[in-house]
Amino acid sequence: MEDINIVIAGSAGEGVQTVGDVLVETIAVHGYSVFAWQEFESRIRGGQNSYSIRISDKPVNAPRMKADILLALNEGACNKYEPLIKQDGILIAQKKTRERMIAIAFSEIAQRELGNRIYINTMVIGALVAAVGMELEVLNHVLTRKFAKKGDKVVSDNLVAAGKGYTLAREGCRGICPWLLPKLDTHYTPIAGKEALSTAAALAGCRFMAAYPMSPSTDIITILSQNEKELGVFTEQAEDEIAAVNMAIGASFAGARAMTATSGGGFALMVEAISLAGMTETPLVIILAQRPGPATGLPTRTAQGDLLFAINAGHGEFPKLVLAPADADDIFKKIMRAFNLADKYQIPVIVLTDQFLLDSIFSVQDINLSQLGPTYYLTDPFKIQDYKRYLVTDNGVSPRLYPGQATHLVTADSDEHDSHGHITEDLSGTVIRMVEKRLAKYRALKGEINPPEEADIEGADKILVGWGSSRNAILEGIELLREDDIRVGMIHFTELWPLPEYRFPESKQYWIVENNTTAQLGRLLRSEYGITIAGVINRYDGLPLTAGYIRRNFNG
């Protein structure tokens, strides 16, 4: 089947997210893959927001901009988003304004026939289910489950509202709606990036999170707080980002796997503490959820502008790990890897996400969570006679105990220290050994870094190179470019520092694809690998990369 792209648009407070969430669940229960992402302004009421839903019988995990169906809840939304409608697409709105559209007076009908305008959203969902040719019975099942705790009358009233919207849309669809989506036996689970990340952190053994709210990272601590009993992660909303990161370091020193989360501005405040974790060799995981900057920037939009900032965060020289998951599936793997390697090498780990990755809803199949489990590296205190917290070893990793674990004295200091953790200024010996010990951890860590993913490299003379959340858009962009007879492949990084030992294929032209203005990955690869960059495809308007954008802006 051809993918179907639905855009639901309206003002903040009109229920755009509610409509989208219920529709996503209905599509998944129907057996189809769904990808959804939201575009919204930085305000609680007003403005115009959208919720885009892409439906397919094949796995889809990337956005498309053009709409097969635009449902506009108000005139302003219609004016803003109508240009997105494909030539053969349709508009669903309250008033007739064009030929290919379904006009349904949702507000008037909800008030007159259902007794309350509150049922507008349920009517809208019913109309969309009808427009794409799905079964009303499946929607009724989803609504019954959603409203079950509110009583039989609420359930009944919403089923009536959904049926009304469904019937009216079916009548309006005649001759203009070509879609028919029968129920399939396949099973997809829709999950938002932030839900995947929160769940993955708990599975990785995280037991403490401190954070100060900053979009787009805020939902992580919200989800963990709301599910504290189920997930077992204690959360603390700190007074600021400096307190949050230091709480996480303290919890880790005390023996708990710990993390914090923030965006660019908050991360700037955390940088000194990252050096503290580097010097005290305390495991720490920081989620850096990127948004456009500088300063406050665009709090509800997406970007990849903090790559070099993350790699270079912290004064002095010490090992750190920087990861950037590509999608929901990869989030589970990278978060587990972040906590395990932070523990193994006793280092800070920065996980680069962004608004698009966290807020988007992905379809996943057959995630075997039982295969995901933490590996702990705390030392057995009963195997140690003379405990030296900073014992010099071949790979730089020293024994690590937490206070109270045994009778051994556990110390740490942000000053340069000796093997016992006591302050030293022995410049001729101890200081050099400690610096070289930390450097040895960097070399050992570098040996564990996975190479970038390669796709369609053979036979391609041009290679698109990206990182993090750009992966699926690049893969779809390759398909479109090959339709234009352009032989193109992909190299994609999700482990960004230390960079892996990797040899770029020769006789290729490399194009950097990033959600920033300065092609930061390109600058990094040029300095570390010496490759020549043939061109760049940058997007920096706050919207995510799409296959169509890549195709339009590739001029190789």
Model regions and ranges:
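Flexible, low-complexity linker and terminal segments
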Residues: 190-194, 202, 339, 343-556
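Peripheral docking tails and interdomain loops at the edges
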Residues: 12, 107-110, 117, 125-148, ...
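Active-site cofactor/cluster-binding pocket
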Residues: 1-204, 208-210, 502
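Short beta-strand segments
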Residues: 72, 92-94, 262, 285-289, ...
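Gly-rich Lys/Arg/Thr-decorated short loops/hinges at beta-loop-alpha junctions or inter-strand turns
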Residues: 147, 171-186, 201-206, 225-231, ...
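Short, conserved loop/helix-junction motifs that constitute active-site signature segments
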Residues: 82-88, 278, 366, 504-507
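Thiamine diphosphate
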Residues: 2-65, 69-78, 82, 208, ...
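A short helix->loop->beta-strand "cap" motif at the edges of active sites that frequently abuts
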Residues: 85-91, 233, 256, 282, ...
